Structures are given as structure tokens and as C-alpha cells.
């Protein structure tokens, strides 16, 4: 490490901030108000120090024979360090980041010790920081301080050795949610219009607005004129959106408008602004379907009701004008939805705002939109299977999905390219415009689009069969729609729910629909012999044998009888439970992985937040508290372990069988959140949510064990003789 240096003369007593919050957000902690370079005192010299070896300290003759390990002295008050940001950051990376990836992890082979000068000694007395966790936290703090333009900082020791459970939860609540928040209006159009999936080669930004939203259209036209550098085109959507129109507009793709609200500025003028929403990860700018539901669960835990409500409002807007909750709000997604969760989402938000003015109107609008989507999307052709009465993921569309990489389907298409003596571009155009007819290829893309609508892209469970499957996940969700709608009509609208077109809905009809779906699911999806819920192939009229964690959704929705739940927990739960939580599918169902059978991200051994959360709520709904806590601890341990050992990362999914590095997932899409530089800035939406939701299931014993990174097996062995208190204050909708 470099030796100590003299820099500014800083009066450390004058800037002492013992009363300041050491766990404030980075934006607050590294604000200009705490900038040491603005607090210079000419009267008394002090020194700032970078991290350094103790032997490099200046020699004082009178003390040269005294050797004290000041860094190991006991102390009652938390220390504060005076730090030169750039020099300490560079020295830290040089010494500790041995693989040069801008992270400090357990895989780096540096000494794992640095020394910092204390503020109370003016940077003279050095104290050691040891271990991966403290050093990676130091790297994160220095990176953030540099982001905020800080040259020198007064860094509280408590910020470096903070309990990792508290630190991660604090970051999610105070930093990650804000970093993932977007809105669509003039203030952010230059960022929000960017589309990493746009293959058209055009440099034109486009936004498409519903025909009925004239004020919104004029707003964006005005914004385009005021900001010519945006190169923004504002287009009206046609009244009727057809597969042909969606195909044709792939040559000029664009963003789809979302809800806006009116507000008054300080001068009393009225303006429009976008209703905010949360995106799945840092590289996204769109409102996604089922990601938003799980994010809302975490947002509500963290009292970010405004964002959860905003996403419901945006979904109402989408159903009103685009006919469905979209995969995401881009033109190429106009025919594709995602797993529907709107009733539960709206009810949870309503519970938090029910005493506010307009809350009942909010609930009415949300459920009116849900009923429209239910009838026109999920129980209509082509998604409804008339014989079973069950529904399938089966979106419309023509040609090859345009949002994929240009080469994504090249291996599949090459035989056809050779057959017709065409290049990839030539064949793609001819096929998309039905100049070439290949029934086998048509069927492939019907299933491919269905897999994408399911949200489970990709998995061997759904590959080449998805559009024919009445899946347990979709039908559990629709059962939940039916029971929620029945409950809301009866409890909140006196059993008379008037739709915008004047139609009156009663609870009885929705109750009958729910009972009919439950009977059909028991007949076609439930296996008494296997104690398992399976998908049903409506074309072959046979049950699938793939064991998927979506079976837990039947418990979450309340489809299962108590007897079925008991059999499922006794026989099937052990097939999914591994060291890190619930795997997406069982090892038996995956089969042998090889060159011709590569790993898929929604298969064993990977685990995803949606499957964990729905399993927790499903199990606790039927009274399985011990099993719920066990699964919660496993999943939170997986996230916490990666966070502690790998520089604070929070990733999209985890390999639940890897005890050391579960964030490393070997699958076709990689893993978002792995390649951070210095600090994780937003985590991943539904993983953030799963952590916050999971902590609501934890008692103090579990939190302490997680903070100490106690492995699940050790923790469970320690509590085998001990009874844990019952769950309290869990929000579980059992309608």
C-alpha cells in the first residue's frame, strides 16, 4: 500500500457528525453537505490518509521502541476514518482485486487486510479492516463516493461491518427500488426510448399513443418539437391491432405509451407526467408483466405503496387500450401477455390505501380491467381449450419473434435457407410475409411465442409443446382471478358490480366459474398416484410428466383441497427442496444434460424468486409453518451468502445446488447482475422483493443466523429441539 500523505488541512472536530445516521443512503451520506473538501480549517493541520501498511507510518523518535497494535485495541465508540477516495480506491483494487474484475470476492487472493487512518487522530493512527466482506463493502462505499464526486470522505466503521441482512435490506429499500424506477414522460424520453432489442438499424425513437388519448398525443408531439435532439416520432395506434399490423410495424418498432397523471407546479400550472413503475433490472426501460407483481410485494413491505399503485394503474391503462397486460410495453409485444396476477396485486394495494379518497374507485377500475382481460384474453380463442374448459398460453403472431438476436434462430432456419437458396435475411422476410409456407416451422413458432408468454423462457417442460398445454400455473392464476372477483363483488360492491358498458356482475357467476375450473383441474391436472399437479396436453389428451415448481401455485391459489395439499407436501415437496430453496423443476424431469440437451434456465438446478414466494404463501395458507420457514431460510441464505462473498451482488436467478457460488448459473441467457463494477446499483427486481418478503417470515433467531451466514443444515440442526413462534401479520389473500 502507498505511504501516508499530507493533503488538505481539515478540522476533524469541526466536522464531527456523531449524530449523523451511519446507514443513510449513499445519496445522503455522500452529499455535498458532508464533503470534507468544503470544511477546510486553516488554523489546525490534520492529515488524511490512504490505506497503507502500518510500517509505512512516520517515525517518531521518542516512540520508536514502542510497538502497539492500535488496530486491535478495544473500543467502545464506532470509529470513523478519514479517506482519500481516489488514492484509497486505487490502492485497494491494486492490492485486493487480484482477478481485476472491479470486485473483491472470496476468489481474490490478496492479503484481505487494509489499514485506514482514524478521524479522531487526523488520519495518523491506523486501524485494520480484514476479510472479504469488510473490504468489499469498502470498495462499494468508495465507488459510490466517487460517483457523487467526492474526493475525501469521513467513513463510519459501522458502514463497513454492518450486519449483511440489514445492509442488503437497507440497500433494497433505500437505493435499489429508486434505481429501478422509471416513468414515461418528456423528462426521461432520451433514456426511456432506448431499446436494446431494436434490430431495425434505425436511429429514430418512436412512441405509440392510443387514439383516444389525444391530450397525451399532443403532449408528446410538443415534447418532440422542444427536444429535436431526441429524433422522436409520435404515432397513433390503429383502433384495431392485428397480427399483420404488428408484423409490419416491426420495421419501425417503438415504445407504447403508459398512464399519465396531472399535477400542478409551484406556480399553479397543470402538467402531465408519467405514472411511475419498476423495471426488472438495470438494463430495462419497460413495464413488464409478472415481474411487476412480485416487485409490488416487496414494494409494499418497504412502504413504497406509490410505486405498487402506479404499476396497477399502468396495467389498467394497458388492458384498456392494448387489450391485455403486455409482456412489456413495446410494439412487438402487443399480441403477447404474461402470467396474470392483477387481482391479488390490486387487492394488496387497496388494503394499504383503503382509507384514502378514491380507493374504492381504484379497486373498481382494477377489477373492471381484470374482467375484461379474463373474457377477451384468457378464456377466449385461441387460449381457451373448449373441451377441458382450461386455458393455455397461446398468443397470436406472424413470423419470427423480432426481439431476439438476429442469429438466435439461425441454426433452426438453416435447413430452410438451404432449401430455398436464401440468406437468413431473405428467408426471414419471405417467411414473415407468408411467401413461404412451412407448417412445421409455423408450429414451432406458435410454441415459441407461447413459452415467452408463460414467462418461463426457456424450459424443457414447455419446449415445442407450450401452446398445447393447459398449465397448472395459468389455471391456478385464473382460479385466483375467479375467486378474487367473486369475493370483491360480494364484500365491496354489495354483490352488484357494474362494468363500464353497463353489464352487471354478481359473485355467484364467478363462484360457479371457480368451482368449474377447480373440478377441471382436479380431473386433468391432479395425479392422485403421484401426489402432483401436472400440465395437461390438450392436443394429445395426456398429462405431462414434468415435475415443475409451478405445482405450488395450486396451493397459493387455494385450488388444492387440504388432503391434496397434505399429500403434495409429504410426497412431492422433497423432490423440489434442495440446499438453496425450491428448484424450478426436479432433477428427474431434466434428464441428462449434454451438447444435444443443454441446460435451460427454468430447469433444475436453478431457483427463481416467483417460485419461492408462491411456495411460501401456498404452504402457509395450508398451515405448513415449519416447511415454510425452512424454505424461506434456504432461499434467503442463498442470496445473503452471494451478497457477502461476492461484492454485494444480487442476481436474477441462482443455482441452488452450488454451496459456494450459487450466483453462477450455467444456462442459455447467463445471469443478470453478475458483472457489476465496484458496486451493485439496483439488484434485480423480484429478487429484491423476495428478500424483503422473506424477512417478514423470519423471527429474530433466523435473522441472526442469516447475518452470520449460518448454513441451513447447521441452523436446522440447532433448532430441531426448539419451537419457533407462530407467524403473525402475514398478508395472505385466501379468497
Swiss-Prot record:
<feature type="binding site">
    <location>
        <position position="103"/>
    </location>
    <ligand>
        <name>Ca(2+)</name>
    </ligand>
</feature>
<feature type="binding site">
    <location>
        <begin position="290"/>
        <end position="291"/>
    </location>
    <ligand>
        <name>substrate</name>
    </ligand>
</feature>
<feature type="binding site">
    <location>
        <position position="108"/>
    </location>
    <ligand>
        <name>Ca(2+)</name>
    </ligand>
</feature>
<comment type="function">
    <text>Hydrolyzes intracellular trehalose to glucose. The disaccharide trehalose serves as a storage carbohydrate that is mobilized during nutrient stress and spore germination. Together with tps1, regulates the level of trehalose as a protectant for cell integrity during heat, osmotic and oxidative stresses.</text>
</comment>
<keyword id="KW-0597">Phosphoprotein</keyword>
<feature type="modified residue" description="Phosphoserine">
    <location>
        <position position="51"/>
    </location>
</feature>
<dbReference type="GO" id="GO:0005946">
    <property type="term" value="C:alpha,alpha-trehalose-phosphate synthase complex (UDP-forming)"/>
</dbReference>
<keyword id="KW-0479">Metal-binding</keyword>
<dbReference type="GO" id="GO:0005993">
    <property type="term" value="P:trehalose catabolic process"/>
</dbReference>
<keyword id="KW-0963">Cytoplasm</keyword>
<feature type="binding site">
    <location>
        <position position="455"/>
    </location>
    <ligand>
        <name>substrate</name>
    </ligand>
</feature>
<feature type="active site" description="Proton donor/acceptor">
    <location>
        <position position="457"/>
    </location>
</feature>
<dbReference type="InterPro" id="IPR011120">
    <property type="entry name" value="Trehalase_Ca-bd"/>
</dbReference>
<protein>
    <recommendedName>
        <fullName>Cytosolic neutral trehalase</fullName>
        <ecNumber>3.2.1.28</ecNumber>
    </recommendedName>
</protein>
<dbReference type="InterPro" id="IPR018232">
    <property type="entry name" value="Glyco_hydro_37_CS"/>
</dbReference>
<feature type="binding site">
    <location>
        <position position="283"/>
    </location>
    <ligand>
        <name>substrate</name>
    </ligand>
</feature>
<keyword id="KW-0106">Calcium</keyword>
<keyword id="KW-0378">Hydrolase</keyword>
<dbReference type="GO" id="GO:0005991">
    <property type="term" value="P:trehalose metabolic process"/>
</dbReference>
<comment type="subunit">
    <text>Homodimer. Homotrimer. Oligomerization occurs only in the presence of calcium. Forms a complex composed of at least tpp1, tps1 and ntp1. Interacts with tpp1. Interacts with tps1; interaction is independent of stress conditions and oligomerization state.</text>
</comment>
<dbReference type="GO" id="GO:0004555">
    <property type="term" value="F:alpha,alpha-trehalase activity"/>
</dbReference>
<feature type="binding site">
    <location>
        <position position="101"/>
    </location>
    <ligand>
        <name>Ca(2+)</name>
    </ligand>
</feature>
<dbReference type="Pfam" id="PF07492">
    <property type="entry name" value="Trehalase_Ca-bi"/>
</dbReference>
<dbReference type="GO" id="GO:0005829">
    <property type="term" value="C:cytosol"/>
</dbReference>
<feature type="active site" description="Proton donor/acceptor">
    <location>
        <position position="652"/>
    </location>
</feature>
<dbReference type="InterPro" id="IPR008928">
    <property type="entry name" value="6-hairpin_glycosidase_sf"/>
</dbReference>
<comment type="similarity">
    <text>Belongs to the glycosyl hydrolase 37 family.</text>
</comment>
<feature type="modified residue" description="Phosphoserine">
    <location>
        <position position="49"/>
    </location>
</feature>
<feature type="binding site">
    <location>
        <position position="99"/>
    </location>
    <ligand>
        <name>Ca(2+)</name>
    </ligand>
</feature>
<keyword id="KW-0326">Glycosidase</keyword>
<feature type="modified residue" description="Phosphothreonine">
    <location>
        <position position="47"/>
    </location>
</feature>
<feature type="binding site">
    <location>
        <position position="97"/>
    </location>
    <ligand>
        <name>Ca(2+)</name>
    </ligand>
</feature>
<dbReference type="GO" id="GO:0030437">
    <property type="term" value="P:ascospore formation"/>
</dbReference>
<dbReference type="InterPro" id="IPR012341">
    <property type="entry name" value="6hp_glycosidase-like_sf"/>
</dbReference>
<feature type="region of interest" description="Disordered">
    <location>
        <begin position="1"/>
        <end position="55"/>
    </location>
</feature>
<dbReference type="InterPro" id="IPR001661">
    <property type="entry name" value="Glyco_hydro_37"/>
</dbReference>
<feature type="binding site">
    <location>
        <position position="336"/>
    </location>
    <ligand>
        <name>substrate</name>
    </ligand>
</feature>
<feature type="modified residue" description="Phosphothreonine">
    <location>
        <position position="50"/>
    </location>
</feature>
<feature type="binding site">
    <location>
        <begin position="336"/>
        <end position="338"/>
    </location>
    <ligand>
        <name>substrate</name>
    </ligand>
</feature>
<feature type="binding site">
    <location>
        <position position="327"/>
    </location>
    <ligand>
        <name>substrate</name>
    </ligand>
</feature>
<dbReference type="GO" id="GO:0005509">
    <property type="term" value="F:calcium ion binding"/>
</dbReference>
<comment type="pathway">
    <text>Carbohydrate degradation.</text>
</comment>
Amino acid at each position: 500500500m502507498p505511504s501516508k500523505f499530507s493533503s488538505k488541512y481539515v478540522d476533524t472536530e469541526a466536522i464531527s457528525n456523531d449524530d449523523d445516521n451511519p446507514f443513510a443512503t449513499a445519496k445522503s451520506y455522500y452529499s455535498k453537505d458532508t464533503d470534507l473538501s468544503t470544511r477546510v480549517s486553516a488554523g489546525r493541520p490534520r492529515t488524511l490518509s490512504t490505506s497503507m501498511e502500518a510500517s509505512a507510518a512516520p517515525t517518531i523518535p521518542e516512540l520508536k521502541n514502542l510497538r502497539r497494535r492500535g488496530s486491535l485495541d478495544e473500543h467502545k465508540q464506532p470509529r470513523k476514518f478519514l479517506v482519500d477516495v481516489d488514492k484509497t480506491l486505487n490502492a485497494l483494487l491494486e492490492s485486493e482485486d487480484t482477478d481485476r474484475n472491479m470486485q473483491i470476492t472470496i476468489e481474490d487472493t490478496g492479503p484481505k487486510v487494509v489499514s485506514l487512518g482514524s478521524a479522531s487522530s487526523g488520519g495518523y493512527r491506523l486501524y485494520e479492516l480484514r476479510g472479504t466482506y469488510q473490504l468489499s463493502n469498502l470498495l462499494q462505499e468508495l465507488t459510490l463516493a466517487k460517483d457523487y464526486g467526492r474526493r475525501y470522505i469521513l467513513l463510519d466503521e459501522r458502514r463497513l461491518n454492518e450486519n449483511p441482512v440489514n445492509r442488503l435490506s437497507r440497500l433494497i429499500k433505500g437505493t435499489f427500488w429508486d434505481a429501478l424506477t422509471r416513468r414515461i414522460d418528456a423528462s426521461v424520453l432520451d433514456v426511456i426510448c432506448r431499446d436494446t432489442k431494436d434490430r431495425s438499424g434505425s436511429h429514430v425513437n418512436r412512441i405509440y399513443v392510443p387514439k383516444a388519448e389525444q391530450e397525451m398525443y399532443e403532449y408528446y408531439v410538443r415534447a418532440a418539437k422542444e427536444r429535436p435532439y431526441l429524433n422522436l416520432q409520435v404515432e397513433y395506434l390503429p383502433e384495431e391491432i392485428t397480427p399483420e399490423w404488428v408484423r409490419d410495424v416491426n420495421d419501425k418498432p417503438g415504445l407504447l405509451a403508459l398512464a399519465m397523471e396531472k399535477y400542478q407546479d409551484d406556480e399553479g400550472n397543470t402538467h402531465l407526467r408519467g405514472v411511475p413503475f419498476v423495471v426488472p433490472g438495470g438494463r430495462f426501460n419497460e413495464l413488464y408483466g409478472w415481474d411487476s407483481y412480485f416487485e409490488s410485494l416487496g414494494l409494499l413491505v418497504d412502504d413504497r405503496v406509490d410505486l405498487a399503485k402506479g404499476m396497477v394503474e399502468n396495467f389498467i391503462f394497458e388492458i384498456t387500450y392494448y387489450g391485455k397486460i403486455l409482456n412489456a410495453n413495446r410494439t412487438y409485444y402487443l399480441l403477447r401477455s404474461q402470467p396474470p396476477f392483477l387481482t391479488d396485486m390490486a387487492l394488496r394495494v387497496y388494503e394499504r390505501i383503503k382509507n384514502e379518497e378514491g380507493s374504492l374507485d381504484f379497486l373498481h377500475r382494477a377489477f373492471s380491467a381484470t374482467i375484461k382481460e379474463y373474457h377477451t384474453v384468457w378464456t377466449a380463442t385461441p387460449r381457451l381449450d373448449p373441451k377441458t374448459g382450461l386455458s393455455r398460453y397461446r398468443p397470436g403472431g406472424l413470423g419470427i419473434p423480432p426481439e431476439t438476436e438476429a442469429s438466435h434462430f439461425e441454426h433452426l432456419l438453416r435447413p430452410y435457407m438451404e432449401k430455398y437458396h436464401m440468406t437468413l435475411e431473405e428467408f426471414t422476410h419471405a417467411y414473415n410475409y407468408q411467401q413461404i409456407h412451412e407448417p412445421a416451422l409455423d408450429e414451432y413458432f406458435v410454441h415459441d411465442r407461447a413459452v415467452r408468454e408463460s414467462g418461463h423462457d426457456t424450459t424443457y417442460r414447455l419446449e415445442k409443446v407450450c401452446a398445447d398445454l393447459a398449465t397448472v400455473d395459468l389455471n391456478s392464476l385464473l382460479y385466483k382471478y375467479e375467486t378474487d372477483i367473486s369475493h370483491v363483488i360480494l364484500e365491496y360492491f354489495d354483490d352488484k358490480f357494474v362494468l363500464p358498458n353497463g353489464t352487471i356482475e354478481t359473485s355467484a357467476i364467478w363462484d360457479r366459474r371457480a368451482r368449474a375450473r377447480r373440478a377441471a383441474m382436479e380431473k386433468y391436472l391432479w395425479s392422485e398416484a403421484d401426489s402432483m399437479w401436472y400440465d395437461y396436453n390438450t392436443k394429445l389428451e395426456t398429462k405431462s410428466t414434468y415435475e415443475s415448481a409451478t405445482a405450488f401455485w395450486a396451493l397459493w391459489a387455494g385450488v388444492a383441497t387440504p388432503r391434496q395439499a397434505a399429500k403434495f407436501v409429504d410426497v412431492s415437496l422433497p423432490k423440489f427442496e434442495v440446499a438453496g430453496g425450491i428448484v424450478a423443476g426436479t432433477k428427474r424431469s431434466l434428464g441428462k444434460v449434454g451438447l444435444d440437451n443443454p441446460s435451460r434456465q427454468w430447469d433444475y438446478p436453478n431457483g427463481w424468486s416467483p417460485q419461492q414466494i408462491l411456495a411460501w404463501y401456498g404452504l402457509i395458507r395450508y398451515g405448513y409453518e415449519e416447511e415454510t420457514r425452512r424454505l424461506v431460510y434456504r432461499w434467503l441464505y442463498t442470496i445473503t451468502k452471494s451478497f457477502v462473498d461476492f461484492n454485494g451482488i444480487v442476481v436474477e436467478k441462482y443455482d441452488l445446488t452450488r454451496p459456494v457460488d450459487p450466483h453462477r448459473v450455467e444456462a442459455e441467457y447467463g445471469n443478470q447482475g453478475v458483472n457489476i463494477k465496484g458496486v451493485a446499483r439496483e439488484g434485480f427486481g423480484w429478487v429484491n422483493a423476495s428478500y424483503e418478503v422473506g424477512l417478514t417470515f423470519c423471527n429474530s433467531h433466523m435473522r441472526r443466523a442469516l447475518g452470520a451466514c449460518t448454513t441451513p443444515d447447521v441452523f436446522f440442526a440447532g433448532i430441531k429441539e426448539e419451537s419457533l413462534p407462530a407467524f403473525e401479520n402475514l398478508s395472505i389473500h385466501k379468497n
